[in-house]
């Protein structure tokens, strides 16, 4: 398989959740959507150590509650079932029973334990799942199918593209693979998990270490993106590690733990950037880099304030280097900043230096902003810490898409 190497970590061309050994996936159309695939699954040929992080939204959806309880008690997952078009959220007691039935049906279909099945849903909130359709879809599940592309399509809602990546790295002389898939286009905001993302790896990883590591990875990737400032009731990130690579068990004291974490971070950050780039109606990926901060938390706080600003996002859409909007966002971020030390560059063009405005050519700046990726670099010159956040521009199409979401 053709690869691109970054240090000792290889990024696979066209990598998927099925790239790690022992993982299978597929997707079918069961009738939740008019024509598109709407029910997907991941299966491991052996129970995998599992970890999850979940939305902080008060109204957590039934599938999320069941998955969270399952992982907390069993510590292992062998299959994940995901439906799109219907969130099964705010659907009362019956919605919970429907999600529980999905878990049971998958376990029966794949001949595995019910407490080894995770359930996820995404789509319209407040509508009951048509369980007859879901039941018929689950009957098509197979534990021998390797069709990650169908899985990636089945979990989408307003996304315009699938999101997937995989990397390989050698640990203990064994080739370890980490794959990932995600969905997310709207209702994306830094808040614990922020969308649906599924990570698979054939690494042998201690479950407690896996859970702690997932929180750290999430903070550096998914929690650093925003599209529209809304956080869904269903958002979660799940990771499965089935140990098929047969490396020595990984934990924080393993000599190559940092190598594993670096590889995992690449997967998570790439997926996060794909989500931000595919924001509803978006035409550009915006990357905000804050450096020279006293702490990483302060750098992250400022980066997220700027990337979440609708005024900044609309200015970028209009190719307008209105750096005053960036100043405004920094000012309300809650982080104390010395104005006399502040420097800002937009698209590589310096607009503020040591607290003073810099004359710049508007045409050059418009050209720099008229790119698929726009970088904003903010230098606080107050320390050594840095953070990066990702988002997208805000366009007329965002309103069009969300004004007719249910039609």
UniProtKB/Swiss-Prot annotation:
Under the heading InterPro entries, the entry gives: Arg_biosynth_ArgJ, ArgJ-like_dom_sf, ArgJ_beta_C
Query: Annotated Gene Ontology MF terms?
Result: glutamate N-acetyltransferase activity; L-glutamate N-acetyltransferase activity
Catalysed transformations (reactions): N(2)-acetyl-L-ornithine + L-glutamate = N-acetyl-L-glutamate + L-ornithine; L-glutamate + acetyl-CoA = N-acetyl-L-glutamate + CoA + H(+)
Q: Which GO BP terms, alphabetically?
A: L-arginine biosynthetic process; ornithine biosynthetic process
Keyword hit for Endoplasmic reticulum: no
Where does this protein hold substrate?
157, 183, 194, 280, 402, 407
Per the UniProt record, the site (Involved in the stabilization of negative charge on the oxyanion by the formation of the oxyanion hole) maps to 122-123
Q: What cellular component terms from Gene Ontology apply here?
A: cytoplasm
Question: Where mainly located?
Answer: cytoplasm
Q: What class of enzyme is it?
A: transferase
List localization entries: Cytoplasm
**Quaternary state and interactors:** Heterotetramer of two alpha and two beta chains.
Which PANTHER family does the record match to this protein?
ARGININE BIOSYNTHESIS BIFUNCTIONAL PROTEIN ARGJ, ARGININE BIOSYNTHESIS BIFUNCTIONAL PROTEIN ARGJ, MITOCHONDRIAL
Q: What does this protein do?
A: Catalyzes two activities which are involved in the cyclic version of arginine biosynthesis: the synthesis of N-acetylglutamate from glutamate and acetyl-CoA as the acetyl donor, and of ornithine by transacetylation between N(2)-acetylornithine and glutamate.
Which named protein is this?
Arginine biosynthesis bifunctional protein ArgJ
